């Protein structure tokens, strides 16, 4: 059996970020072959990732990468905010977002198959799982392409808990960034009221009519009252009609128009939205750790 030196163990740990005992075991298993040891650890990393696949990864980072006329907004999840704050995880998010913006994959599976310096994006995710000990997952992304007369604007809030990407027609990137900040803060649902689906509009109107009648309002004034309430609701969910967060004396549409443009589209990601966090009791948590 080959003798394994402390220097070899350190080198392998530096390459992979694993613990001392894991590094030593891999070197013993491969009789000191550094490259094979890296492969062994990566294979064990796959096993770790599969073992952790039942966990809920609801923390993480949302990020935006802009590459020429393309931009990607990405969410990558982990299990705890402490891992989300590590350089290892942050670097993974940055590299994956950049790669997605460059390559424009069609799906998460396609994104995971993209080539990187270490193999593929999936390999990088697995390695991060191995180093951090947590389930890491590329949850979602969108890629947007802009025209020559359009501009991108992005805004990241609270270290990546919220990311917003905006495309403007005719206005500059500084204006787009201001609008992205508004989107991150206010969370509109549509660019303008014309985008609100007809069935949703009809449903809201029906609810408002019944609400007004239940308040005992005379039928002859219900229609006018509902019209006012419906208009207020539309202004609350439509970006163009919202009071601009940096200047409540004007709407977002007026602000952008004053800069010579209009809003084309926006995307907003909030980390963990729609993910139901698993609530383990203390005993279950300890038992799960023992099983790991």
Curated annotation (Swiss-Prot):
Disulfide topology: none
Coiled coil segments of this chain: none
Pfam family of the protein (one): EF_TS
Localization (cell): Cytoplasm
Gene name of the record: tsf
UniProt record similarity statement: Belongs to the EF-Ts family.
Classification via InterPro entries: EF-Ts_dimer_sf, Transl_elong_EFTs/EF1B, Transl_elong_EFTs/EF1B_dimer, Transl_elong_Ts_CS, UBA-like_sf
Keywords, sorted A to Z: Cytoplasm, Elongation factor, Protein biosynthesis
GO cellular component, one term: cytoplasm
Name under which the protein is recorded: Elongation factor Ts
GO molecular function annotation: translation elongation factor activity
Residue ranges, annotated region (Involved in Mg(2+) ion dislocation from EF-Tu): 80-83
